[in-house]
Swiss-Prot record:
Comment on bound cofactor: Binds 2 magnesium ions per tetramer.
Lineage: Bacteria, Pseudomonadati, Pseudomonadota, Alphaproteobacteria, Rickettsiales
Name the record gives this protein: Phenylalanine--tRNA ligase alpha subunit
Gene, per the UniProt record: pheS
Species for this entry: Rickettsia bellii (strain OSU 85-389)
Binding annotation for Mg(2+): 258
Biological process terms in GO annotation: phenylalanyl-tRNA aminoacylation
Length: 349
């Protein structure tokens, strides 16, 4: 009995003075471990009578429980002290200089694309999208390209391995493919633009193998060339934010439109004419290829290069600079991520 009380007092004295969890663990082993003080006391049970063994066993179990409670209580105190110490050492020093915040910026192509979309939204155009990898039908045949058209040649188009419905696979050369898919899957009227990446085997100051296009389509009853001229004229003046800009429509040829035209602009009478886009009335064969009755519906289409419009508006001289990743160039020509294009506040800040 006296020995049990002595062990309990010894445990209380040692544990209450502990200042670290490591030392507390050592005392736990000392008293309750495999070769600990309490465990050694249990070994005395074998030398006692049955009655004394029962009484002594109860006392040892009670001793063990009390020591465990003392250790647990001390452990909670030490853990709280350790946490408070850590929190106090982790305080933010407000006198330290702040880290420089590096904010990203908007690439001029992205900015130009957003501005163009904003302008077309003014005329009620929605947005359609489609795959970059296409088959020959959507890219050429449905758009009235002849089998021997130069655009079908390997030196102009990136062909891929494999076929779809016995048609060669390729990287789309224009976003007109989106127009074909939309007309096949829907019913007129249509009024949408198709922005996206396009691919052609060409590279110089004014051409890159990958470039961005926006192509537009309007299909409805009683659509004529006057509607096309109005939309293009108002779009150009709105995008360049210049109501005095001059436009001229030159006769041209595209397989998918008839009649066809190319649009030139100049900012003032002293400037040279600059070609900016192609357009025309949708060819009846194109409507026939997508199952639209060309005796009831007509329409117009247009296509423009986003890089071309960005170069003209932001005064960029070389198309290849858009994709070279020169941080100095990007810093000069990029836009703030807070300057979201809108017609009310002005497209470009």
């Amino acid at each position: 009995m006296d020995n049990i009380e002595t062990i309990l007092r010894l445990a209380e004295e040692k544990i209450l003075l502990v200042q670290s969890l490591k030392v507390l663990q050592e005392y736990k082993v000392e008293f309750l471990g495999k070769n600990g003080i309490v465990t050694n006391e249990l070994k005395k049970l074998g030398s006692l009578s049955e009655q004394d063994r029962k009484e002594f066993g109860l006392k040892i179990n009670k001793l063990k429980e009390e020591i465990q409670n003392i250790i647990k209580a001390k452990e909670e105190i030490l853990e709280e002290e350790e946490l408070n110490l850590k929190l106090s050492s982790d305080k933010i020093d407000l006198s330290l200089p702040a880290r420089r915040y590096k904010q990203g910026s908007i690439h001029p192509i992205t900015q130009c694309m957003e501005e163009l979309i904003q302008v077309f939204a003014k005329f009620g155009f929605s947005i359609e999208d489609g795959p970059n990898i296409e088959n020959d039908f959507h890219n050429f045949t449905a758009l009235n390209f002849e089998d021997d058209h130069p655009a079908r040649q390997m030196h102009d188009t990136f062909y891929l391995k494999g076929q779809e419905n016995d048609k060669p696979m390729l990287l789309r050369t224009h976003t007109s493919t989106v127009q074909i898919r939309a007309m096949k899957n829907g019913k007129p009227p249509f009024r949408f633009i198709a922005p996206g990446r396009t691919y052609r085997s060409d590279s110089d100051m004014t051409h890159t193998p990958m470039f961005h296009q926006i192509e537009g389509l309007v299909i409805d009853k009683d659509i004529n060339m006057g509607h096309l001229k109005y939309v293009i004229t108002e779009f150009i003046r709105c995008f360049f934010e210049n109501s005095n800009i001059e436009l001229r429509f030159r006769p041209s040829f595209f397989p998918f439109t008839e009649p066809s035209a190319e649009v030139d602009i100049r900012m003032s009478k002293t400037d040279k004419w600059l070609e900016v886009l192609g357009c025309g009335m949708v060819h009846p064969n194109v409507l026939k290829n997508v199952g639209i009755d060309n005796s009831q519906y007509q329409g117009f289409a247009f296509g423009l290069g986003v890089e071309r419009f960005a170069m003209l508006k932001y005064n960029i001289k070389d198309l290849r600079q858009f994709f070279e990743g020169d941080m100095r160039w990007l810093k000069h020509y990029s836009f703030s991520s807070f300057d979201i294009p809108n017609l009310a506040g002005g497209l470009t800040k």
